[in-house]
A protein has these predicted regions:
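Actinobacteria-biased recognition of intrinsically disordered, low-complexity terminal regions
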Residues: 1-8, 94, 230-233
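Membrane-active amphipathic alpha-helices enriched in small hydrophobic residues
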Residues: 37-46, 72, 77, 190, ...
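Transmembrane helix-loop-helix hairpins at the membrane interface
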Residues: 109-233
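Hydrophobic, aromatic-rich alpha-helical transmembrane segments
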Residues: 5, 29, 33, 37, ...
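Structural signal for membrane-spanning alpha-helices in multi-pass inner-membrane proteins
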Residues: 17-23, 43-51, 81-86, 157, ...
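Alpha-helical transmembrane segments in multi-pass membrane proteins
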Residues: 2-54, 64-71, 111
């Protein structure tokens, strides 16, 4: 009976994380910062309660050095690629974002040094490449685990993608009207789902969630800097 209660509570907690993910775009920035980190912690605890060990969560202490090595090498490559794309005429408009270009220097520094590395990269990797990938792999196997965690990662980006419509350059490039806007959202989901597969492979090869977290952070921070540069000239 106790085991059944524990498992029911764990699944209910994961349902709460999903509900938070669906509504988080409407929350104030400070609430999202705390909420993402709490959601990651709750998901990890739930997955652990459902039988996933530390290695399955990408949290085995002996693998973090490998995670840093893999993440450092791949993160540097990704950052260089994004920086290069941001300077090319055909792709530069995709980086424009009115919200980012409107940030003060102080706000931009906080975003790049705290919010993106912790709220986005660390929290999302602990959630999706830690808890979700670990649990899905444990229940469904390696291939299905990667597929499920990556698709859910893509869907996690629907609320912020909807919130960003009209402010980012992606919607402008895709064209106006409902078709262009939903095309931009669909493209965001597809791109982040593919990124989820890459992040999952990094976690598999390194054995640590640190690797995808470093690459995720490098990708987003470089993209943020590119968006700020595109908006300020």
């Amino acid at each position: 009976v106790e085991d059944r209660i524990r498992r029911t509570a764990a699944w209910a907690a994961l349902g709460g994380v999903a509900a938070y993910g669906a509504g988080r775009a409407r929350l104030p920035a400070a609430a999202r910062f705390t909420g993402n980190l709490v959601a990651a912690g709750v998901a990890l605890a739930a997955a652990s309660a459902l039988g996933v060990d530390r290695a399955g969560l990408g949290l085995a202490a002996g693998r973090h050095v490998q995670g840093i090595r893999w993440g450092g090498m791949a993160g540097g490559t990704v950052a260089a690629a994004v920086a290069g794309l941001a300077t090319i005429g055909p792709t530069r408009p995709y980086f424009a974002d009115e919200r980012i270009s409107a940030h003060s220097n102080r706000r931009a520094a906080v975003e790049a040094s705290l919010r993106i590395p912790l709220e986005t990269a660390a929290a999302e990797e602990l959630l999706f490449r830690g808890a979700v990938l670990g649990l899905a792999t444990d229940r469904l196997g390696d291939v299905a685990g990667v597929a499920v965690s990556s698709v859910l990662f893509g869907l996690w980006h629907v609320p912020p993608a909807l919130d960003a419509l009209g402010a980012s350059g992606v919607a402008d490039v895709a064209g106006g009207g409902p078709v262009g806007r939903w095309g931009a959202v669909t493209g965001t989901v597809a791109a982040t789902s593919v990124a989820g597969v890459v992040f999952a492979e990094l976690r598999r090869r390194s054995g640590s969630v640190v690797a995808p977290a470093l690459v995720h952070g490098a990708l987003n921070v470089t993209g943020f800097a590119a968006a700020r540069r595109a908006g300020t000239g």
